[in-house]
Amino acid sequence: MEELVGLREGFSGDPVTLQELWGPCPHIRRAIQGGLEWLKQKVFRLGEDWYFLMTLGVLMALVSYAMNFAIGCVVRAHQWLYREIGDSHLLRYLSWTVYPVALVSFSSGFSQSITPSSGGSGIPELKTMLAGVILEDYLDIKNFGAKVVGLSCTLATGSTLFLGKVGPFVHLSVMIAAYLGRVRTTTIGEPENKSKQNEMLVAAAAVGVATVFAAPFSGVLFSIEVMSSHFSVRDYWRGFFAATCGAFIFRLLAVFNSEQETITSLYKTSFRVDVPFDLPEIFFFVALGGICGVLSCAYLFCQRTFLSFIKTNRYSSKLLATSKPVYSALATLLLASITYPPGVGHFLASRLSMKQHLDSLFDNHSWALMTQNSSPPWPEELDPQHLWWEWYHPRFTIFGTLAFFLVMKFWMLILATTIPMPAGYFMPIFILGAAIGRLLGEALAVAFPEGIVTGGVTNPIMPGGYALAGAAAFSGAVTHTISTALLAFELTGQIVHALPVLMAVLAANAIAQSCQPSFYDGTIIVKKLPYLPRILGRNIGSHHVRVEHFMNHSITTLAKDTPLEEVVKVVTSTDVTEYPLVESTESQILVGIVQRAQLVQALQAEPPSRAPGHQQCLQDILARGCPTEPVTLTLFSETTLHQAQNLFKLLNLQSLFVTSRGRAVGCVSWVEMKKAISNLTNPPAPK
């Protein structure tokens, strides 16, 4: 009935459907429909991304603030329970441990029951996807709810697990961007553009960082450094615009909720502006960078080794395969027991939240000098005005608690990374770096109590500046990024230590990048995700290794003059996704590519003719409409390994055919590239 059309009685106009003819107010309905069509064309104008990026930033800011609000309520409820439960050590211990155990067990079980890809940080998988690998359902919108709920429960455990939300928020932002992109393409009816989709995903990663730290500049640079090996400068504006929208709304919500008087940085500092550091201190900042680089190598090696052990050990692997919540509960119980404040947690400042950890470590006064003549009390309740008291113990001193904190959190964080739940690992690493810098700064303050004399003027040493440099250097070394220096400035709102912090970050990266893969690359290796390693150094001979030395020679070509019987045999006996199409069996000149699925469909739709004296060949199938793809890019047999690797990374390629004088002679994929690079960096032993 709805397909029938007619004319209104006494009306000579365009035909209308019966449903419209009988519907109420047809003129108003047509006007509204026309207005919506006009609005759709304006909002979703082809090539216009402003609305998309602004929507992405605003949505992620709302999600981030709502999560922080909900997490804050749960954390305050836990603190209230711990305070009001009484003086019984058993009840206090149970309230401190059972609460996070229940939250983590629910987080692990809930997220894993919906989709296993919602666990962990999410950045390693995103790096793999942006490199051109397709991971099924990883950006599905159902993962969004699982990750939000699981991450909220993880962060609600407070300082017992000591985890952050940067990585998961990058994943959440990318999922929202992918969903909005699908809505956009469906609404305007344009075909999906893979290149543009990747550009939007990198911009979404910047939004994820910006809505956590309210740091748009470092968010953009960090996402570029972590997510992609090559980035087009013309796409900068997308990341900056979306990240600025997200960071602005995120901080504006805090002002509207009376949490802040105006839009300011997250972590307040009071560093001297006139003379923040003396010139000789540059040497100590560079030395701090070297220390952070060495410690980051140790951390990366231990973390990757322990994660591999957990995945391969007979007992832990079986527990993770069958009862992930049980493994999560056991690991959380151990970590929560260690951080119990009346016990070992007394020496770990475990009553401080992660924000309070950074607020105290960035203090510009020297705790060691302040405790030389007097011992501050350890209060029954946390004193927000004297957070540094949590770091002091009369027997351990400031140096003992800082060193103990570093040693314990070093392995506790490694253990926490094995728990299968949504969690971020950047913020704990940032705090560990701040503790390393604070320890060195306190040692220098004791060694030079009056400061270092330069030009007859003495200025006391500020340990908080070293904590800032250590946080940027250690986190930058672990993630192989330089933008952590800018992140430190945006977090604190001060740039007085710009040069020493940047020098420390560069020194740490120089050591870490030459010795270990980054935290995210190491996770990719352990999870056995598709991964194309970098070629490090100039003297390993990558310019002398040619494609013909490592390419796959056994390729199956289809010539235009191949009989259909042979084509059917090739299709049924191989499982490749595409075949190189050559001009003839004799010449082997590469002229195109035929997709296997389309070729099978064409063969099924057009059965071979049984006319006598006529033998059908592949050319007949192609002439009837079987689509072929032009060969836009190939490798020459004389192409070097270095050039091939750069080409694969630049264009996010998975495989390329190799030609010699136009003839198809082989193909190169990630498998051959990885094997060639591995043989180059670690030559096999001579037989």
Curated annotation (Swiss-Prot):
Effect of residue 261 to Q: Ca(2+)-insensitive
Transmembrane segments annotated in the record for this chain: 52-72, 161-181, 202-222, 236-256, 282-302, 329-349, 396-416, 417-437, 452-472, 486-506
Leader peptide range in chain numbering: none
Location (main, coarse): membrane
InterPro entries in the cross-refs: CBS_dom, CBS_dom_sf, Cl-channel_core, Cl_channel-K, Cl_channel_volt-gated, ClC
Cytoplasmic side: 507-687
Domain of life, per lineage: Eukaryota
Activity control, per UniProt: Activated by extracellular Ca(2+) and inhibited by extracellular acidic pH.
Residues annotated to bind Ca(2+): 259, 261, 278, 281
GO cellular component terms, semicolon-separated: basolateral plasma membrane; chloride channel complex; plasma membrane
One record GO biological process: transepithelial chloride transport
Gene3D superfamilies noted in UniProt: CBS-domain, Clc chloride channel
A Gene Ontology molecular function term of the record: metal ion binding
Catalysed reactions listed for this entry: chloride(in) = chloride(out); bromide(in) = bromide(out); nitrate(in) = nitrate(out); iodide(out) = iodide(in)
Impact when changing residue 259 to N: Ca(2+)-insensitive
Membrane topology according to the record: Multi-pass membrane protein
Keyword field: Bartter syndrome, Calcium, CBS domain, Cell membrane, Chloride, Chloride channel, Deafness, Disease variant, Ion channel, Ion transport, Membrane, Metal-binding, Repeat, Transmembrane, Transmembrane helix, Transport
UniProt-listed SMART domains: CBS
Domain CBS: 551-609, 626-684
Involvement in disease: Bartter syndrome 4B, neonatal, with sensorineural deafness: A digenic form of Bartter syndrome, an autosomal recessive disorder characterized by impaired salt reabsorption in the thick ascending loop of Henle with pronounced salt wasting, hypokalemic metabolic alkalosis, and varying degrees of hypercalciuria. BARTS4B is associated with sensorineural deafness.
Family under the similarity heading: Belongs to the chloride channel (TC 2.A.49) family. CLCNKA subfamily.
The protein's assembly and partners: Homodimer. Interacts with BSND.
Function: Anion-selective channel permeable to small monovalent anions with ion selectivity for chloride > bromide > nitrate > iodide. Forms a homodimeric channel where each subunit has its own ion conduction pathway. May conduct double-barreled currents controlled by two types of gates, two fast gates that control each subunit independently and a slow common gate that opens and shuts off both subunits simultaneously. Assembles with the regulatory subunit BSND/Barttin for sorting at the basolateral plasma membrane domain and functional switch to the ion conducting state.
Protein name as it appears in the record: Chloride channel protein ClC-Ka
Organism listed in the record: Homo sapiens (Human)
